[in-house]
Every structure is written in C-alpha cells, then in structure tokens.
C-alpha cells in the first residue's frame, strides 16, 4: 500500500457505526497521530458543529480535534461567503448549519426575499419551512443543499435524509440545487485546500461507494474502501471504477502501512 502524506476520512461506517465503535478506527487515528500524518474528517452531517463531532469521536476513544473536522455545513458557508459576502440566507437545517452560516458573516432571514436558500437536514422540518424555501427559490434565490443523501441510517432503520427534504423544493420549483457535500467536489476541494498538498499525496477513506469513494474519484485522488459500513467488497467489485484499495477494516490498513 502506498504511504500517503495525508488522509480524508469519513465518519459513520468508517470511524463508528451509529453509537458503536468500529474496531481499528481509533487505532488508525493513533497511527496517524503518532506518525504526525495530517488528516481531516469529512462529513455530510450538517446538523453538528466541529466541536460536537469531536465530542462524539472522543466518546469512541478517537483522538480528534475540532480543526480536523470539515462538515457540509462549513463547506456550504464558505462557498456562499466566497461567492457573495454578507449574503442573506433562508435556511432549513440544524444547529451546525446555523452556526456555520452566521460565523461566516451571512445573515439568516425568515422570509422568501433572500439571496440564497440553503437546505440541510432538519428533523423538525415543517410544511411552512418548505413553503418559504419554495417561494424564495421561485423569487430567484440561489438554491443550495448541503448534501444529496436521500436516506440516513438510524436505530429504527433508514430514515429520510437531506436529499429527500431537498427534493420537495426542487420538485415543486423545477429547479435543481447545487449540492456541496460528498460525492460533489466542493467539500473535497475545500478539504484539499486546507491540507495544501498535491492530490497524489492524499487518499480518501470511507465505507460507502456512492458517497465516500466517488467523492475521491470525482476530485482525482486515491481511495481506500473499508468493509465496515454499507458497501460490501462484492458491491465495489461491480463498479466501473473500483477504489484503489479495499480492506476488511482499518486494522488491515495499519498492517499494510507498517510493512
């Protein structure tokens, strides 16, 4: 296995599974930390702040820091502030998205006359929220969604994800949003910019082919698939572009790196 200078790492299915630890995850991060290898956690979860993400990782005995976390909310806020500083935004989403937008100097408004509509996962979404978003998009607001995931794994099973919520507005208006999170290149490009390395020096680590592995492929970096989450080894063998590597778990990756 190639020794990379840095890694971009998925969370759910790679570092943990729901509220359960994944064997090899904490050990892999310890290996990176002990060898001073930079890494970022890249997540489509827009509901949590980097501090909250770090707290969960630490509960899983993973030694993480907030400045190592790149959420779809952060990538969205940066993208808008670069395009249109001080823009007005109508948002549907959680605390993580609201914090990211306001920290970026964007003004959140509760009406349909805004520069941008941003939709992130909102477990308390209402018809009224969707109505305001729909009217704002019809009025000409730029339409952005933090991530396209149509379902998310929960203890009860697979529940509607942000892509499902976003689809209500896109179907009603006939306008497709610009997606920021994996597998789209915007969140990955931001992560690569933070690392400041050549693409050939960085690998993406994740379990889900359509999201994690494709995010790496879409920006031209190597990919490491771990068989600890959604996509099985058999799943990835049928893909037109397979990942660069596929391991049973991150313990195997460590063993390969230590050869």
UniProtKB/Swiss-Prot annotation:
One of its GO terms (cellular component) is cytoplasm. CDD domains: HAD_Pase_UmpH-like. Gene3D superfamilies: HAD superfamily/HAD-like. It is an enzyme of class 3 (hydrolase). Signal peptide: none annotated. Its cofactor is Mg(2+). Its EC number is 3.1.3.-. GO terms for molecular function: metal ion binding; phosphatase activity. Pfam families: Hydrolase_6, Hydrolase_like. Keywords: Hydrolase, Magnesium, Metal-binding. Catalyzes the dephosphorylation of 2-6 carbon acid sugars in vitro. PANTHER family: 4-NITROPHENYLPHOSPHATASE-RELATED, HALOACID DEHALOGENASE-LIKE HYDROLASE DOMAIN-CONTAINING PROTEIN 2. Belongs to the HAD-like hydrolase superfamily. NagD family. This is Acid sugar phosphatase. It comes from Staphylococcus epidermidis (strain ATCC 12228 / FDA PCI 1200). The gene is nagD.
